[in-house]
Protein backbone atom coordinates (compact mmCIF):
# COMPACT_ATOMS: atom_id res chain seq x y z
CA UNK A 1 0.00 0.00 0.00
CA UNK A 2 0.95 3.64 -0.53
CA UNK A 3 -0.04 6.70 1.52
CA UNK A 4 -3.27 8.24 0.15
CA UNK A 5 -6.83 9.02 1.22
CA UNK A 6 -8.31 6.49 -1.24
CA UNK A 7 -9.88 3.22 -0.04
CA UNK A 8 -7.24 0.93 -1.55
CA UNK A 9 -4.16 2.88 -2.61
CA UNK A 10 -1.46 0.76 -4.22
CA UNK A 11 1.89 1.19 -5.90
CA UNK A 12 3.53 -1.56 -7.90
CA UNK A 13 6.96 -3.07 -8.25
CA UNK A 14 6.93 -4.76 -11.66
CA UNK A 15 9.55 -7.24 -12.78
CA UNK A 16 9.73 -7.96 -16.51
CA UNK A 17 12.32 -9.76 -18.59
CA UNK A 18 12.85 -6.87 -21.04
CA UNK A 19 12.31 -3.76 -18.93
CA UNK A 20 13.69 -5.08 -15.64
CA UNK A 21 12.34 -3.81 -12.35
CA UNK A 22 9.89 -0.92 -12.65
CA UNK A 23 8.55 1.13 -9.75
CA UNK A 24 5.05 2.51 -10.41
CA UNK A 25 3.64 4.79 -7.71
CA UNK A 26 0.98 7.44 -8.12
CA UNK A 27 -1.77 8.86 -5.90
CA UNK A 28 0.52 8.89 -2.90
CA UNK A 29 2.17 11.65 -0.90
CA UNK A 30 5.03 9.52 0.45
CA UNK A 31 6.72 6.15 -0.08
CA UNK A 32 8.14 4.61 3.06
CA UNK A 33 9.90 1.77 1.24
CA UNK A 34 13.22 1.43 -0.55
CA UNK A 35 13.26 -0.54 -3.79
CA UNK A 36 16.39 -2.50 -4.75
CA UNK A 37 17.45 -3.17 -8.33
CA UNK A 38 15.35 -0.55 -10.09
CA UNK A 39 15.70 -0.13 -13.87
CA UNK A 40 12.82 2.28 -14.53
CA UNK A 41 10.78 4.56 -12.27
CA UNK A 42 7.26 5.88 -12.80
CA UNK A 43 6.56 8.24 -9.89
CA UNK A 44 4.00 10.87 -9.01
CA UNK A 45 5.33 14.43 -8.91
CA UNK A 46 2.07 16.33 -8.51
CA UNK A 47 2.89 19.79 -7.24
CA UNK A 48 5.45 22.36 -6.18
CA UNK A 49 4.81 23.55 -2.62
CA UNK A 50 5.77 27.08 -3.69
CA UNK A 51 3.27 27.10 -6.59
CA UNK A 52 0.56 25.51 -4.42
CA UNK A 53 1.13 28.12 -1.69
CA UNK A 54 1.01 30.96 -4.23
CA UNK A 55 -2.24 29.63 -5.72
CA UNK A 56 -3.79 29.31 -2.25
CA UNK A 57 -2.67 32.81 -1.23
CA UNK A 58 -4.06 34.26 -4.48
CA UNK A 59 -7.41 32.51 -3.93
CA UNK A 60 -7.10 30.25 -6.97
CA UNK A 61 -7.64 27.19 -4.76
CA UNK A 62 -9.60 26.88 -1.53
CA UNK A 63 -8.34 25.60 1.83
CA UNK A 64 -9.99 22.18 1.45
CA UNK A 65 -8.27 21.50 -1.90
CA UNK A 66 -4.98 22.89 -0.59
CA UNK A 67 -4.99 20.56 2.42
CA UNK A 68 -6.16 17.54 0.42
CA UNK A 69 -3.41 18.06 -2.14
CA UNK A 70 -0.76 18.02 0.58
CA UNK A 71 -2.27 14.95 2.29
CA UNK A 72 -2.87 12.86 -0.83
CA UNK A 73 -0.40 13.82 -3.58
CA UNK A 74 3.37 13.70 -3.87
CA UNK A 75 5.16 17.04 -3.93
CA UNK A 76 8.23 17.68 -6.04
CA UNK A 77 10.28 17.73 -2.82
CA UNK A 78 8.97 14.33 -1.69
CA UNK A 79 9.54 12.98 -5.19
CA UNK A 80 13.20 14.04 -4.89
CA UNK A 81 13.47 12.46 -1.44
CA UNK A 82 12.02 9.21 -2.78
CA UNK A 83 14.48 9.14 -5.66
CA UNK A 84 17.42 9.98 -3.39
CA UNK A 85 16.44 7.22 -0.92
CA UNK A 86 16.85 4.57 -3.62
CA UNK A 87 19.79 3.20 -5.57
CA UNK A 88 19.25 4.57 -9.08
CA UNK A 89 22.56 3.36 -10.49
CA UNK A 90 20.80 0.97 -12.90
CA UNK A 91 17.83 3.23 -13.74
CA UNK A 92 17.39 4.17 -17.41
CA UNK A 93 14.19 6.25 -17.20
CA UNK A 94 12.29 8.31 -14.66
CA UNK A 95 8.76 9.14 -15.76
CA UNK A 96 7.02 11.80 -13.68
CA UNK A 97 3.31 11.07 -13.27
CA UNK A 98 0.14 12.90 -12.28
CA UNK A 99 1.47 16.46 -12.54
CA UNK A 100 -1.11 19.03 -11.50
CA UNK A 101 -2.28 21.36 -14.27
CA UNK A 102 -2.14 24.38 -11.97
CA UNK A 103 0.35 23.52 -9.24
CA UNK A 104 3.32 22.08 -11.12
CA UNK A 105 5.98 23.08 -13.60
CA UNK A 106 7.10 20.10 -15.69
CA UNK A 107 10.13 21.88 -17.13
CA UNK A 108 11.45 22.91 -13.71
CA UNK A 109 10.78 19.44 -12.27
CA UNK A 110 12.61 17.73 -15.11
CA UNK A 111 15.60 20.10 -14.98
CA UNK A 112 15.87 19.77 -11.20
CA UNK A 113 15.97 15.98 -11.37
CA UNK A 114 18.34 16.04 -14.36
CA UNK A 115 20.81 18.05 -12.28
CA UNK A 116 20.90 15.20 -9.75
CA UNK A 117 20.79 12.36 -12.29
CA UNK A 118 22.24 13.58 -15.61
CA UNK A 119 22.73 10.02 -16.88
CA UNK A 120 19.01 9.14 -16.54
CA UNK A 121 16.32 10.08 -19.08
CA UNK A 122 13.74 12.21 -17.22
CA UNK A 123 10.29 12.70 -18.78
CA UNK A 124 6.94 14.09 -17.63
CA UNK A 125 3.94 12.04 -18.69
CA UNK A 126 1.67 13.59 -21.29
CA UNK A 127 -1.25 12.28 -23.33
CA UNK A 128 -0.02 9.99 -26.11
CA UNK A 129 3.53 9.71 -24.76
CA UNK A 130 5.37 6.57 -25.86
CA UNK A 131 8.57 5.44 -24.14
CA UNK A 132 10.83 2.43 -24.43
CA UNK A 133 11.56 0.89 -21.06
CA UNK A 134 14.51 -1.50 -21.20
CA UNK A 135 16.88 -2.85 -18.58
CA UNK A 136 19.74 -1.16 -20.42
CA UNK A 137 19.81 2.32 -21.94
CA UNK A 138 21.03 1.04 -25.32
Give, region by region, the residue ranges found by the protein language model.
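Core dinuclear metal-dependent hydrolase active-site scaffold
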Residues: 1-40, 133-138
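Cap/insert and terminal regions of metallo-dependent hydrolase folds
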Residues: 35-127
Amino acid sequence: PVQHDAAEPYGYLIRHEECGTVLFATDTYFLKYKFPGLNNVMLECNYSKEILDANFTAGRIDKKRYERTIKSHMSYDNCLLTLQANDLSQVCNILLLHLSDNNSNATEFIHGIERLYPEIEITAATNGLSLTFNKNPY
